[in-house]
Amino acid sequence: METIYTLNADKFLLLLLSGFMIGLSKTGIPGLGLLSATLAAIVLPARVSTGIVLIMLICGDIFAVIYYRRNAVWRYLFRLFPFAFTGIFIGYLLMKKINDEQLRPLIGIIILIMLCLNYLWKKKSNLNIPHRWYFAAILGLIAGITTMMANAAGPIMIIYLLAMNLDKKEFVGTGAWYFFIGNLFKVPFSAKLGLINPDTLQLNLLLLPGIICGAITGILILKKISTRVFNIVVEVLTVMAAIKLII
């Protein structure tokens, strides 16, 4: 397993970049989340990368829930959590059976599927999305499984939140609290799998400045950049990185 003692400078810088992108994704540029998870899976063994990314995500989540702490619509979260937690447990059981060679391409495939979903819902945003309980059940289960195995539930949550017809701040705030609580719920399962341990936490500590810089940068530059162009670039890079994982 890679540790802070065996990582070369290039790999460490790529992980620092991954942390920076996670910070950015939590304060206004969500598309970077998938790219950061994919990049970490390229740099590190696939299983280990999920634990490293999880702690980075939680650090980023803290910034998001502080910034949007009053904007969550809790009734939608309470509807989703039982199914999401069940999905996380299913993902944990699957992770017990999968090795690095199997998980690496699987992460790539999950990322590509999530990107396709994201693209379809952007193109068909006027579709009538169901509000019934089974909608939360299905998306909650899928989000739980994908987040446990690949830290890649973002597009699923976007679909769910779109269906709730929230305003912009409620949309971001509700999503921020979902990911914070969901990611905390994943910690004991990841620790049980050996994906979070003293070595990974030490590495996470060194990556913390990148996350902080990303979160602050996201707040400062969000209104000054073309989000559409930026997201296109991010999605292209994510596709390339996901394909690299698969092949």
Listing of model-derived features with the role each one plays in the protein:
Residues M1-L13:
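Short, strongly hydrophobic alpha-helical membrane anchors
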Residues K11-F78, L139-G140, G144, G154-I211:
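Small-residue-rich hydrophobic segments that form or flank transmembrane alpha-helices
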Residues F12, L54, G108-I111, L115, ...:
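Residues within membrane-spanning alpha-helices of integral membrane proteins
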Residues T38, Y92-K96, I159, I219:
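Small-residue-mediated transmembrane helix hinge/kink sites in multi-pass secondary transporters
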Residues F63-R69, L106-H131, I219-L220, M240-I247:
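Transmembrane helix exit motif
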Residues W74-M114:
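Glycine/small-residue-rich loop that forms an oxyanion/phosphate-binding "nest" at active or ligand-binding sites
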Residues I90-M95, G144-A152, K186, A241-I247:
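Hydrophobic alpha-helical transmembrane segments in multi-pass integral membrane proteins
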Residues I216-L237:
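Interfacial loop-to-transmembrane junctions
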